[in-house]
């Protein structure tokens, strides 16, 4: 049986269109796809508590904070997401009874998000399941997990996710602040198995967000987000520039509702048009427009220049990332 690797297929498409990204495009796409697979794995543990990945991450920050509460602005910074997204996430957690909004004791302009007792129970139960199952990386051995963590550590340090904190009095830097290692320490303190699989899974998540931020400068002029760009890219590289909505969802590893919403937005931007299926009246095709093709080409040029936020890695290192993650992707 011949195994077709969509990452390598996509990489070949990019190269044939003249975008030379070395091994960095394949590595960035592998990180994205693995992050999606880990998200799908996590949903099994999170679903009974009506938690999504973003809700769970926000709840975790509150759970592990000193007083169980944190300003919304700080929560946004910890999660590496836009304040608007944090507001929406906290709204959802508040409706579920997992979080309360409370006034800041000293700053009337600020609002705190505070985890509730119900939120703590949801965290404890879901984290126990996730840690027991290898955090979605059971296809790797410990050596591979450590190697991948070390490679992604270079990317995160280069992007400022890992910081050196100077000691008082101008002495040489005395310690390193790494949110991944801090989170690992917190997990161990609560009795959950952590180790290389936990820290590597969290590194993948944070690196995905950092790549997303790096690509934003190329996507923003065309009003594209990562999800919109990925959907548009699938259509751009398809044989006829069109695809059934269900198939598009499978390629993107997202729920059909999310695909519909994404295509709605792309249609409003005139980057995609919905057309009737030629033989199936029940089906609808999404077709990329000429404006959509120009947007893909311009944004891809920009992302190629920055090596997708992975410029700190050599081609050999980027290739190693792709190779290690292929074990996870094939198992998924």
Predicted regions: what is each one?
Residues 1-49, 166-222:
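N-terminal leader segment of winged-helix/HTH proteins
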Residues 28, 32, 36, 80, ...:
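Short amphipathic alpha-helical segments with heptad-repeat character
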């Amino acid at each position: 049986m011949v195994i077709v690797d969509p990452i390598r297929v996509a990489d070949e498409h990019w190269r044939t269109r003249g975008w030379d990204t070395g091994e960095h495009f394949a590595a960035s796409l592998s990180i994205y796809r693995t992050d999606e697979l880990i998200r799908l794995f996590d949903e099994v543990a999170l679903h009974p508590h009506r938690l999504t990945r973003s809700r769970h991450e926000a709840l975790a920050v509150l759970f592990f904070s000193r007083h169980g509460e944190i300003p919304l602005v700080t929560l946004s910074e910890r999660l590496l997401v836009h304040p608007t997204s944090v507001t929406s996430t906290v709204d959802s957690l508040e409706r579920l009874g997992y979080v309360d909004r409370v006034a800041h004791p000293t700053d009337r302009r600020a609002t705190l998000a505070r985890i509730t007792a119900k939120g703590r129970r949801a965290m404890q139960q879901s984290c126990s399941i996730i840690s027991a199952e290898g955090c979605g990386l059971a296809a790797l051995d410990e050596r591979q997990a450590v190697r991948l963590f070390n490679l992604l550590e270079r990317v995160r340090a280069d992007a400022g996710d890992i910081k050196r904190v100077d000691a008082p009095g101008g002495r040489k830097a005395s310690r390193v602040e790494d949110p991944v290692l801090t989170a690992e320490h917190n997990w161990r303190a609560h009795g959950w198995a952590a180790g290389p699989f936990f820290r590597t899974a969290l590194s993948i998540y944070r690196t995905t967000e950092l790549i997303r931020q790096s690509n934003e400068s190329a996507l923003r002029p065309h009003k594209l987000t990562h999800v919109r760009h990925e959907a548009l890219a699938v259509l751009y590289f398809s044989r006829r520039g069109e695809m059934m909505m269900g198939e598009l969802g499978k390629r993107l590893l997202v729920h059909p509702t999310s695909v519909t919403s994404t295509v709605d937005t792309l249609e409003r931007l005139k980057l995609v048009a919905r057309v009737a299926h030629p033989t199936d009246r029940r089906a609808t095709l999404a077709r990329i427009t000429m404006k959509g093709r120009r947007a893909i080409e311009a944004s891809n040029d920009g992302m190629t220049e920055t090596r997708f936020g992975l410029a700190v890695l050599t081609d050999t290192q980027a290739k190693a990332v792709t190779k290690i993650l292929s074990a996870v992707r094939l198992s998924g």
